[in-house]
Amino acid sequence: MVIKQDKGCLEFGKEIIVAGVLNVTPDSFYDGGKNNDLDSALNHARRMIEDGADIIDIGGESTRPDSSYVSADEEKLRVIPVIKELSKETHIPISIDTYKAEVAEEAIKAGAQIINDISGLQADDEMARVAAENNTPIIIMHIKGHPHDFPKDPVYDNLIPEIISFFERRIEYAVNSGIAHNNIIIDPGIGFGKKPEHNLAILRQLNDFKCLNLPIMVGTSRKSFISKVLELSDEQNLPKSDSRLAGTLVTLIIAVIKGANIVRVHDVRETIQAIKMYRAIESAKCKEKT
């Protein structure tokens, strides 16, 4: 599958696409406050591109548990200047991480080429129109609850079939709204209304989502379920601590093995190194003496 864009093509199936996360927020769980000013944000984006990022995913509102709602106007103030400047200097596609149609529309005008909607086209009725009218690829994520209102004790009768059914409904809605089927990417939403055991099961059964015949994005980077699984201490349990990096890399390699096409990460260089090592092992051949 190929998604054509003004700045080139994203081709799925041959290589894993690495999306580097750029949060221009004061309160994101990992990098909140690091990239609040334009120069810091641009410098971080440049570092990720230098490290090999294929996409820069820019977000202006934290969606971690208990995060605060941000108005569309405030969100635009955070992301639009970064998108405008970054799009002038790089051929790398820019993704806008938002569930607000107004923000997405302005971001596309500023140079963004992909919409990453964590609400799965549920939070804003206008989002599908924006994607359709601009012929913009869109990432539809599964979420149980609302971006700022996850259930504290989520329950699934049959986890994977329920998520697949969700995607079937949202894909049908997207296509009926004018979004081209080949402009849709799915994301099972690790950590969004899921317990640690749900996240682990999704990774183990990620291949099951291939029945939808769409590219799959996975984001596990430094999420709290890693700390819970690894039983990290309070100090180690901080997402800014490197203690979550090892667990992150393992989950990402499992995702790649199980069929992920895109991985959304904070640590671009380390992720690419891990994928390269996995690929080397997978393709290794040793000639035996005869």
For each feature predicted by the language model, list its residue ranges.
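Conserved hydrophobic/aromatic pocket- or pore-lining residues that grip, position, or stack substrates
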Residues: 22, 52, 115
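Catalytic domains of carbohydrate-active enzymes, especially glycoside hydrolases
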Residues: 43-59, 258
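N-terminal amphipathic alpha-helix/helix-capping segment at the start of soluble metabolic enzymes
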Residues: 1-25, 172-179, 284-287
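Short strand-loop junctions, especially beta-strand C-caps/beta-turns
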Residues: 27, 189-191
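Active-site loop-to-helix "anion-binding N-cap" substructures in soluble metabolic enzymes
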Residues: 3, 53-55, 170
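Active-site-adjacent loop and "lid" segments of alpha/beta metabolic enzymes
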Residues: 5-6, 30-39, 43-44, 63-85, ...
